[in-house]
């Protein structure tokens, strides 16, 4: 049985719920996890002074200013075009919470913006759970999501998300951490590799067109380590796209690598998921200081969100995003940090 450890009161939600923060530690990593949004609030590597991700020292800054820093959006992360889908012959209309034209991350009151319950807490791991009720944001079924965060002996931070439902529904949760491996004002001094031959081109709403775009010969080709800051046609490339790792969920494998040329800290990403959303953080402009007083402007951090492809329910040939009663959706991702 897991040892019961201390929970720190970190804040209070708008509904008066107490937000707790717990610490897990091991393998050179120290992580602080918040019940609100199952947020990784802080993550540090022994021998490296700066935090590895973006966040805030005060809870009140999260609901006011966070762009999903360290959070777990869902029940269906990323975008659904027009908020529309058909499942088992029934049409559904979801909340249009992005510019009134698209559905994003499960709605305006999604699980990244609500308080989770701590199920277990040990020295090196914490388990949290939340129920997304039937009808919220237009989704069918009561969907239960459990998150297990654990640190291991080789600088590894592992995540297991497990989702169940009592009605057929959509399910796809992800970790939305913004990484910065050197603590500088922007993360453009990083090299990155993504093991994908294709990416998903998008329209003006950032909804996939349905095509699979070959990365070869484009600024999206990260099959070998390359600078994150790239230019195409004389303009800086702006990344907020899904990279296609496979057509279905697989055994866990290495899919991405990021490295700070300034600090020597590297991040390897291993996952079961068929896609990874690479977002370079170019839209960031946070009005208040972040961890350690840092300012978060454009490119302050980057995301590698392991996931089902966005808008998958509306595109034939995209990976499955449907969860049915009796099934358990298990999504696993490891973030492995090393310092030269």
Labelled PLM ranges:
Residues 2-340:
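An exposed, glycine/acidic-rich loop-and-rim segment of catalytic or binding clefts
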């Amino acid at each position: 049985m897991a040892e019961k450890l201390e929970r720190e009161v970190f804040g209070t939600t708008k509904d008066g719920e107490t937000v707790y923060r717990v610490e897990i530690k091991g393998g050179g990593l120290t992580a602080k996890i918040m019940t609100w949004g199952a947020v990784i609030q802080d993550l540090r590597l022994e021998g490296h002074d700066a935090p590895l991700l973006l966040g805030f020292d005060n809870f009140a800054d999260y609901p006011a200013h966070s762009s999903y820093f360290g959070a777990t959006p869902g029940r269906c992360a990323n975008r659904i075009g027009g908020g529309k889908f058909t499942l088992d012959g029934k049409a559904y209309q979801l909340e249009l919470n992005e510019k009134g034209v698209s559905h994003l991350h499960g709605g305006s009151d999604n699980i990244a913006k609500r308080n989770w319950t701590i199920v277990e807490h040990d020295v090196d791991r914490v388990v949290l759970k939340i129920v997304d009720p039937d009808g919220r944001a237009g989704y069918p079924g009561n969907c239960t999501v459990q998150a297990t965060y654990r640190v291991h002996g080789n600088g590894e931070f592992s995540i297991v998300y497990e989702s169940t439902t009592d009605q057929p529904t959509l399910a796809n949760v992800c970790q939305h951490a913004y990484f910065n491996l050197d603590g500088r004002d922007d993360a453009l001094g990083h090299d990155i590799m993504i093991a994908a031959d294709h990416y998903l081109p998008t329209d003006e709403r950032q909804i996939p067109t349905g095509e699979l775009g070959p990365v070869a010969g484009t600024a999206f080709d990260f099959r070998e380590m390359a600078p994150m800051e790239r230019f195409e046609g004389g303009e800086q490339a702006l990344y907020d796209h899904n990279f296609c790792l496979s057509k279905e969920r697989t055994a866990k494998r290495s899919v991405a690598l990021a490295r700070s040329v300034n600090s020597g800290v590297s991040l390897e990403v291993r996952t079961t998921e068929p896609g990874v959303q690479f977002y370079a953080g170019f839209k960031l402009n946070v009005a208040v200081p972040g961890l350690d007083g840092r300012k978060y402007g454009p490119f302050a951090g980057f995301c590698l969100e392991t996931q089902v492809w966005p808008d998958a329910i509306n595109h034939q040939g995209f990976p499955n995003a449907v969860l049915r009663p009796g099934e358990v959706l298990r999504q696993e991702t490891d973030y492995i940090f090393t310092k030269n």
